[in-house]
A protein has these predicted regions:
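Acidic, His- and aromatic-enriched active-site or binding-groove loops in soluble protein domains
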Residues: 169-176, 249-264
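A short, flexible helix-boundary coil/loop motif
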Residues: 395-439
Length: 439
């Protein structure tokens, strides 16, 4: 492919106020208006004692401007200017400059972030009432997943930035950053939506605040129409008393990885060798005659009492998956890696294992956010960054709802695909009665 034009330094001038590059923002922000987003922002976000009085004025349209920019692909404060370019101000009223939005974000404190988090939850409920975001939630199973990620930062002035553990290429490393904690809601036939998100310092323990986050996510799922069984899934950081207690109080079931402490090790040793059953796993094949799996992975279960020395002791199922360690292919006897998780579901052990492994779906949400608004943590102020990630979560849910309305495969598409196919559509503005000739 060859370029068929030659350009001089003055040949490209973008001065047409009748052109827009993000025409798809019109239906997306119309959906936001139909679900009461601006009203929720006006009602719940109140900055009573601002440092800069003008900076805290009109938070609703300023935050709506930020959310619209994120839906169009903004990943830093300056990128919000794209909703003011060309003819965008003709399509939307109350569009604010990036500097004005940044001033508002820097007014946010911990309490204001909690206000914005309540907007996220209530708007998700409103979206579920307008769009079938969680199909079969009333009858089938609903899954709540909880996990955290570490977003790297590099500036010395970043409030809350500290060294925390993260895994890269399967190896645990220390990395400087900030650590959002997120909960998502999904069903078997839907992509996950974000029920809650909270920014924390990089060195914060993964489980801090997890019990409260899970309780809020369960309430949000119920309000969004999940009247069936709810299953809460998490990795070993969340296999603790607080999370289990929140699940039991709310009538939800749990499937949580357990840390291999001495009590768990004793339970593993007590499993009889004949109890292990091969299961579906990458590389496994199924016997065409018997239907049995020929696999390097096996599961078994045993009753287990967790938190036995506390008032929250509970007896349920300890399901263990063991996988042959690929580092020792020529060992005389198989060398196994064990992965135990604690659950009170009534699924068969092999199905419970598959359902538990589907907890990894939350990583698709993190991938969407990192490929969009969370490509950067833009501000030096912790409160501003807390507001930023919550607006990113609202934008994620809004795009997900727009994808469901668009139909076909858009309901489960990546965020970048939704922006490319739905939002970032160039268009020309013209009078409604403008005559055109057709030949």
């Amino acid at each position: 492919m060859q370029v068929s034009h030659s350009f001089a330094s003055q040949s490209a001038v973008f001065d047409d106020d009748h052109l827009v590059s993000c025409a798809g923002l019109v239906p997306v922000m119309t959906l936001a208006q139909q679900t009461g987003l601006t009203g929720l922002l006006s009602e719940k976000v109140q900055i009573v004692a601002p440092r800069i009085k003008s900076g805290a004025a009109n938070p609703s349209p300023k935050l709506a401007t930020l959310i619209a920019g994120m839906c169009a692909g903004a990943d830093c404060i300056d990128d919000i200017d794209l909703v003011r370019s060309g003819g965008m101000t003709t399509l939307f009223d109350g569009v604010y400059a990036p500097s004005t939005v940044g001033t508002l974000l820097r007014e946010f404190t911990f309490g204001h972030a909690r206000q914005l988090e309540s907007v996220l939850r209530d708007h998700l409920v409103a979206l579920c009432g307008r769009v079938d975001l969680l199909p079969d939630a009333a009858k089938g199973s609903v899954f709540i997943d909880i996990d955290s990620l570490l977003r790297p930062v590099y500036g010395r002035a970043k409030q809350g930035a500290s060294y925390g553990h993260t895994k890269i290429a399967g190896k645990q490393i220390l990395r400087k950053g900030l650590s959002p904690l997120a909960t998502t809601i999904s069903t078997a036939g839907s992509a996950p939506v974000i029920a809650g998100m909270r920014l924390r310092a990089g060195k914060t323990a993964s489980a801090k605040g997890a019990g409260r986050m899970v309780a809020q996510a369960i309430r949000t799922a119920r309000a969004a129409g999940a009247s069936g069984q709810i299953l809460v899934r998490g990795d070993s950081a969340y296999g603790n008393r607080a999370v289990v207690r929140s699940c039991l109080r709310a009538g939800a079931r749990f499937s949580l990885v357990m840390i291999r402490n001495p009590a768990v090790e004793r339970a593993l040793a007590a499993i009889d060798e004949s109890a292990w059953t091969p299961v579906s796993y990458p590389g496994a094949v199924q016997d065409p005659d018997t239907g049995a799996w020929i696999s390097d992975a096996e599961v078994a279960e045993i009753p287990y009492t967790a938190f036995a020395s506390t008032p929250d002791r509970i007896t349920a199922r300890l399901i263990v998956r063991r996988v042959k360690d690929a580092r020792f292919p020529d060992a005389l006897f198989p060398v196994w890696r064990y992965h135990p998780f604690f659950t009170n579901t009534d699924l068969p052990a092999d199905q419970a294992d598959i359902t538990h492994r589907q907890h990894a779906i939350i990583e698709t949400v993190f991938a969407d956010l990192i490929d969009g608004p969370l490509a950067h943590i833009p501000s030096g102020r912790f409160g501003a960054n807390s507001a930023w990630i919550l607006c990113a979560a609202i934008a994620h849910n809004l795009l997900r709802a727009a994808g469901v309305l668009a139909g076909e495969n858009h309901g489960r598409a990546r965020g970048s695909t939704l922006r490319r196919k739905i939002v970032n559509i160039p268009a020309r503005l013209r009078p409604a009665e403008w005559c055109t000739s057709r030949t």
